[in-house]
Design a protein with these regions (language model features):
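Hydrophobic beta-strand segment of the Class I
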Residues: 49, 165-166
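Conserved alpha-helix/loop element of class I SAM-dependent methyltransferases that forms part
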Residues: 58-81, 96, 100
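A short acidic, Gly/Pro-enriched loop at the edge of an enzyme's catalytic core
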Residues: 153-165
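Class I SAM-dependent methyltransferase SAM/SAH-binding core
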Residues: 82-154
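Core SAM-dependent methyltransferase catalytic element
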Residues: 256-277
């Protein structure tokens, strides 16, 4: 597995000084206000969220979701596995995990179909935006996925329930990153695995081109299509505020995770954090 790059982000691009607690939308004072502002933003763009994601990422987001689901294929195929996709939004990562269940991990599994000698895997998608979950449910007809409206910092699940917890482009929006990691750790079963897929900032020429697109072009297109400016001005700011890979790995270790790694995707534009309980 690829290990994290020691310098994936230009130091001058990161906020300096105090330790970052969590997301901080403009004007939000405190964690409760930050969480409410994030919920309001995603509610405002829910109707066109999927279209914008695919257009603005030039469909690379689909590659990232599928690659992440493939990484966790073995866990997904464990008999009776319980899987949680946290901050699931309209469900794209959730659906990628579900699709992976149809791909056997071995010839023997292909013959018997699905998880061997045990109950089927159950996938949950959780988000605190009602509007986003409504969209996810509309897209999930015919799929055995349970949707739960829940706050990632106070999950309604018992400790040790899940063999896998994922989050794609949602963890960055939490009002408190350490509390978010603590909740993931709590709901994971012993030896359970976690994966956080989120944006980074690449280096070199690719990084310079990416920053122009991400900070100038993307907000303009997002605002034009959605008719709402706030979320697409917030997006690049939230990526800048998010901890660097080195710091995220330190936070994961502090939360109790071991075997922590960061694997860059597409020149470091995005990357996958992994850890085990």
């Amino acid at each position: 597995m690829a290990q994290h790059d020691k310098s994936p982000i230009e130091p001058s691009d990161r906020p300096m000084g105090e330790r970052i607690v969590g997301a901080a939308p403009a004007g939000a004072q405190g964690e409760a206000a930050a969480a409410e502002a994030v919920r309001d933003m995603f509610t405002s763009i829910a109707p066109r969220y999927d279209l914008l994601n695919h257009v603005l990422s030039m469909n690379i987001d689909r590659v990232w979701w599928n690659r992440t689901a493939r990484v966790f294929s073995e866990v997904l195929h464990r008999p009776g596995a319980q899987v949680l996709d946290l901050c699931c939004g309209t469900g794209d990562m959730t659906f990628a995990l579900h699709r992976r269940l149809t791909i056997p991990t071995s010839a023997k599994a292909a013959l018997v179909g699905g998880p061997m000698n045990g109950a089927p895997t159950q996938i949950f998608g959780a988000d605190f935006s009602h509007a986003m979950l409504v969209r996810a449910e509309q897209k999930s007809v015919g799929r055995n996925i349970r949707w739960v409206e829940a706050d990632a910092l106070n999950l309604p699940f018992p400790s040790g329930q899940f063999q896998l917890v994922t989050s794609a482009f949602g963890f960055r929006n939490l009002a408190n990153y350490d509390r978010g990691l603590a909740e993931i750790y709590r709901v994971l079963a012993p030896q359970g695995e976690m994966g956080i897929l989120d944006f980074g900032e690449p280096k070199g020429l690719i990084g310079k081109l990416y920053r122009v697109y991400f900070r100038r072009v993307l907000p303009a297109i997002g605002t034009l299509i959605s008719g709402v400016r706030g979320p697409y001005a917030y997006l690049p700011a939230s990526v800048l505020r998010f901890p660097s890979p080195d710091e995220m790995l330190q936070r994961m270790r502090a939360a109790g995770f071991h075997e922590v790694t960061w694997t860059p995707y597409t020149f470091g534009i995005a990357g996958l954090y992994r850890g085990k309980k």
